[in-house]
Amino acid sequence: MVRWLYSTNAKDIGTLYLIFAVFAAMIGTAFSVLIRMELAAPGVQYLNGDHQLYNVIITAHAFVMIFFMVMPAMVGGFGNYLVPVMIGAPDMAFPRLNNISFWLLPPSLILLLASAFVEQGAGTGWTVYPPLSGLQSHSGGSVDLAIFSLHLSGISSMLGAMNFITTVLNMRNPGMTLHKLPLFVWAIFVTAILLLLSLPVLAGAITMLLTDRNFNTSFYDPAGGGDPILYQHLFSKTTLYISFFYLIYKFTLLKYSIYTNTGTTTVENVFNFNNFYLEYNKTYPNTKVPSTSFLEWFVGFTEGDGSFIVSTRGNLMFVITQSTMDIQVLHYIEQELGFGRVIKQGHKTSRFIVQDMNNLYILIQLFNGNIVFPSKQNSFFKFVHHFNKLSNFPTVAIISSLTVPTYYDNWFCGFTDARHPRGCFTCSLLGNSTAYRFRFLLTQKGEMNKEVLISIANLMKGTVRSHSVKDVYEITVNGIRNMEKIIDYFTNHKLYSKKAKSYQIWLEIYESIKNGEHLSPDSRNYLKMKTQQINK
C-alpha cells in the first residue's frame, strides 16, 4: 500500500491512472445506463418524473467520463507508460510532481460525486452555464462542490501537462531530434500544450462563477452590469482546445492501429546519405554507388576502428586499422567504395587509407550527421575544421546532431565487426551439470558514450555496466530469450570479419543445446570443446 501511495515511478503512476480510469468508467457507465433506460420509451420511466435528478445524472455522467475516464486513461495512463520508453528516458522529468498529479484526482472525483448528493444535486449540464448555475437556480452547495472538483482536476491536468512538455523537450535520447519522435509522443506533447493553454481559461471562468455565487460579484449577472455570454466565450475557447486534443489523439491512435494491425512494421531510416550520393555521383559518375546497407555497416565499422587523422604537418587522412587476419574486410571496403588503398604494416596489422582530398570530401559527406558516438563526433569535427581550412571545396556545414541506430539497420552489425569494441559471442557449460549460459558482449570506451550505449543496449534487450578497465563500458545481453533477438538480428544482417565464424560456431552450439543435445554426457563434452573455439 505504501508503495502505491508514495511511488514516483512513471509506470506505477500510469498503472494507478488506468485503475482510476476503469473505476470512473464503471461509475460513468452506470450513469449512462440510467440515462438510456429513462430515454428508452416515451413518458416517465424510472426516475418518477424527477427532471432535476435526470439533469444531475446527465451532468455527473459527462464530468466523470471526460475528466475522470478519458483524460486520465489516455494521457495519464498511456502517456506515463509509453512516452519515457519511446524517447529513451528513465522516468518523467518531475517524478514527485507526477505523484501529485495523480493523487489530486481521487478527491476531485469524491467532490464531484458529493455534488450529486448535496441538496438536489448539480443539474446544470456539463457546461455549467449561468444563469442555470447561478445562485437563483441552484441555491445549495452542489454547484460549488462541482466547481471545486473541476479546480482540482484542472490543477492535476496542468501539472501533468508541464511534466510531459518538460520530459519530451529535455529527456530525449542523444540524436533523437523532434522530427524523429514517434507520432504518439507528438500527440501527447501537443495535447499537453493545448491543455496548458486552455485549462487556466476554464479555471478563470469557473472561479468568476464561484464569486458570483458566493461573494456578490456580477461577472455574469446582467443586473450588475455583467454578461452571461462572457462565460460562453471563455468556456467555448476551452472546449475548442480540448476537442482539438481529442482529434489529434484519435487520429494518432488510428495511425498506430493501421500499422500494428497490418502485421508489418514501417521503420524510418535514421541515416541520411543523400549528400554522400550527390558528391559520389559527381566524382564517379560511371561507377556503381555503394548500397545503403553497406554504408550503414561502414559507419558502424568506422565508429569502432576508423580514425580521422590530422598529422603534425597538417596532412589529413582517414584510416581504418585491422588485424591482417581480417584484411579481406578492408579489401571489401575498398571494393565497395571504389577508392582508397589497403596496405600492410608488419605481419599483424593492415590498414585502409584515404588521403585524396576529393575522396575525403566524399567521406565527410557520408559521416556528417550520421555519427552515433559523441567521442567519434568530436574527432570528426576537428577533422572537418582542418579540412575546411586546407581545401578549396565549399565549406562543410557541420551537423551537430547524433544519429540513433535502429534494430533494422546495419550499423550495429558493422560496430560488432570492428576490432576495438571487442564484440564477442560467448557460451559456458557450467561444471558437470546441465546448466549453461549464453552471452553477447560489446565494449566501448568513454564516459560520454555511455548514454548512447544504453540506447543501443535497449535495442537488444541488454544492459550497460562498467568494465574492469577504467573508463570502459560493456553492453551485456544475457538469457536464452534475449539470444533469440540477437540471432534474429545477425541472421538478417551479415558479419564480414572473423566474428562471422565465431557467430556460426556459437549459433551451432545454441541450436544443439536448444535441441537438448547437452543432456548427453558425450555430446556435452563435445560442446564444451566447441565453446573454446568460438572466439579463437
Curated annotation (Swiss-Prot):
InterPro entries: Cyt_c_oxase-like_su1_dom, Cyt_c_oxase-like_su1_sf, Cyt_C_Oxase_1, Homing_endonucl, LAGLIDADG_dom. One of its GO terms (biological process) is intron homing. The chain crosses the membrane at residues 15-35, 56-76, 99-119, 145-165, 183-203, 234-254. It is found in: Mitochondrion; Membrane. One of its GO terms (molecular function) is cytochrome-c oxidase activity. It is a multi-pass membrane protein. Gene3D superfamilies: Cytochrome c oxidase-like, subunit I domain, Homing endonucleases. The mature protein may arise from proteolytic cleavage of an in-frame translation of COX1 exons 1 to 5 plus intron 5, containing the aI5 open reading frame. Mitochondrial DNA endonuclease involved in intron homing. PANTHER family: CYTOCHROME C OXIDASE SUBUNIT 1. This is Probable intron-encoded endonuclease aI5. It comes from Mycosarcoma maydis. The lineage of its organism: Eukaryota, Fungi, Dikarya, Basidiomycota, Ustilaginomycotina. The gene is aI5.
